[in-house]
UniProtKB/Swiss-Prot annotation:
Sequence similarity: Belongs to the methyltransferase superfamily. RlmKL family.
PROSITE patterns: THUMP (PS51165), UPF0020 (PS01261)
Location(s) in or outside the cell: Cytoplasm
The organism of origin for this protein: Psychrobacter arcticus (strain DSM 17307 / VKM B-2377 / 273-4)
Name of the protein in its database record: Ribosomal RNA large subunit methyltransferase K/L
Chain ranges of the THUMP domain: 60-175
InterPro entries found in the cross-reference section: 23SrRNA_methyltr_KL (IPR017244), DNA_methylase_N6_adenine_CS (IPR002052), RlmKL-like_Mtase (IPR000241), RlmKL-like_Mtase_CS (IPR053943), RlmL_1st (IPR054170), SAM-dep_methyl-trfase (IPR019614), SAM-dependent_MTases_sf (IPR029063), THUMP_dom (IPR004114)
Role: Specifically methylates the guanine in position 2445 (m2G2445) and the guanine in position 2069 (m7G2069) of 23S rRNA.
Reactions mediated catalytically: guanosine(2445) in 23S rRNA + S-adenosyl-L-methionine = N(2)-methylguanosine(2445) in 23S rRNA + S-adenosyl-L-homocysteine + H(+); guanosine(2069) in 23S rRNA + S-adenosyl-L-methionine = N(2)-methylguanosine(2069) in 23S rRNA + S-adenosyl-L-homocysteine + H(+)
Amino acid sequence: MTETTALASSTVSSAPLSLDLIITCADGLEAPLQTELTSFGIASEMKSTGRLAVTGTLRDLYKICLWSRVASRVLMLIKRKNINAEYDVAEQLYGLAKSVNWTEQFSLEQTFAIRLSVDKRVAVSQQFAMLRIKDAIADTFNEVYESRPNVDSKNPDFSIFATVNDKQAELYLDLSGTSLHRRGYRVAMTEAPLKENLAAALLYSAGWHQKNEAGDAPFYNALIDPMCGSGTFIIEALLMHCDYAVGIDKAANQFGFYEWQHHDAALWQEMIDDAQTRFRAALEIANEQPDTLPLIFGFDADNGAIIATEKNLIAAGLQDLLPLLDIETRALDQLSTLLKPLVADGRLSNPLIITNPPYGERLGDEEMIKPLYQSIGLILQDSFAGSGVDPMLGILASHVEQVDILPIREPKTLRCHNGAITVYFRYGTLIAGQTGNLVNRFEKREIEVEDGQDFINRLQKNLTRLKKLAKKDNVSNIRVYNADLPDFKVAIDLYGDYAHVQEYAPPKTIPPETAKKRFNLALMGIREVFGINREQIFIKTRARQSGNDQYSKQGNTEKRGKFYIAREDGAYLYVNFTDYLDTGLFIDHRNMRARIKDNSRNKSVLNLFAYTCTASVHAALAGAKKVTSVDLSQNYLDWGKQNFALNGLNVSGNKYQFVAADIFEWIKDNTEQFDIIFIDPPTFSNSKKFQGTFDVQRDHAALINRAMNRLTADGILYFSNNFTRFELDEQLTERYDIVDITQKTIGFDFDIKKPIHQSFEIRHRQSI
């Protein structure tokens, strides 16, 4: 059988040692590790998953242990031997271990431990095989000293790794000691922290280590981590930039080669001294010439995470750089407010945006994961829209589907592990966002339509007029047609790139064939005027509703179940064109939501009959100190939570509340006071969850009176409803200060002469 001995010399000699090394790393990090080793001037080749082979010198060994940011361990091959798995494998392992002169590796006074990895094709007791290797080492020492070193399985001076498959067995000495990923700076932690060497590997993958074309400055001029946790990406990026040898902190006593017989203490100290000198020099340059340091931004919605980041920066020896960094408590929804001015003045000319969002195990609620990742993409696109800057974006996720929705051009994906969790790193250039409103994109195209020219002309006239107004107000969702012509009874709403068409059920006097022909003509006209494909048009038939029918799911459709994203006044909102009669966004209340937004800063806001919480989102984005959304439907509240997450708003705390309850009962039992209350009830409801029925004309006075008990003395209650024959109870006008604001809340795309809703601003009467 073939045997290979990796270290032939028995004593320290003047000739350089030739070491066969295995450099281990987490699965998936082989390429970044190889990139790093190449930068050290060390050639390597892939041996297997998570293992790179290196033939090097003692200096190479020390360099890897001292400087590698990606490696986990450095193992030195002691001996390799072919085996026959059909025979006694444990005894073959004993023979292999017995053929090694262990006294050349460590002394009698030092402790050791055995680790064994057995291929599943090999039938052997792992515990017994480890015992036989230990026996061989003990026998070797007994033959020389008549004594043996002790075993310490928890904290040994030397760890011996053995691997065996059906053809070969190998013995390694762990010269790295404790895992190389431990930097020593993590004195404060947050939930599910990112491993240090994984963070470094991802920074390598994204190109953080690269220089510009001239080679005299970093390739990236900034690093942004919008959800920085305990600051691992930030710290690793700074350590990389400042030429810090990550093994320095371990140099005191934690490397496995310190008691090794071939350790060259003088060479090691020389390399330590050089590393410390390089780090001090880099820090000095960064402090004296701040422009040489890339801009570093670390944000998190959790102030505890920011405190942890600052503590870890200090522990990493980077305290002198703290004044040069922007580390602050900032929620994701506030990110674009900071980035846009920096992009505009050119300070973010080539940034790397890299982050580890609270995916899966960190977030807990799977329903919030997709909106969170979508929000990151949308917010960043908005921040860099129209700037000509193409930032690099790198994001981790626990499932590849989560990062599939990110707007990245020619994306690359790295499958790796953060501890025991499989994660995916998606990185590439951010696809630039679009400026301006979306309505202006619609351009007419010629389609042969035999009849229906009157409809086409009216639709074109409406669109031409409304596009100008939409551009002026930066509006993307509008109603362009509402049964303007008697033969074409449809309502057409534009949501960004999509048309939502509602056909009013024709009267019985119109033959079905005639109604169908007219509707098909309308669809052809829509395609011609808007220049869109059939897939961008969603159709519903609107008949008189009873009870909660408008909130019930509709019949089967090929496009059912898909959510689209609408933009409105700085907010992103999910809409569904297929599953319900309504889309989740009442565009006739656009001005009302803007009114609530304008008055919500530092206010407590209550949204009753909240539906999908669109008004709540606007209040939260405006800086409301608390927003409570109450609705009878948990499904719609869940939709509302996703709207919050889509805008980077954290729903896990107490700031934003979502309450599924009977509105009348809730405002009767709840005693909290609110600065702003918004009520937009249905015209009629007889839900099984509701106690009795609700009729807005009959019950609005009682509803408003109860709600006013929850309104602060100087607060505002906004009341709106869509009942066309609604009349406000006169007793309310006698009791409160009420202003009809209908004309101010009806948008430019609705007929003010036939208001689709009525709205009122209600306050407590002030004592004179």
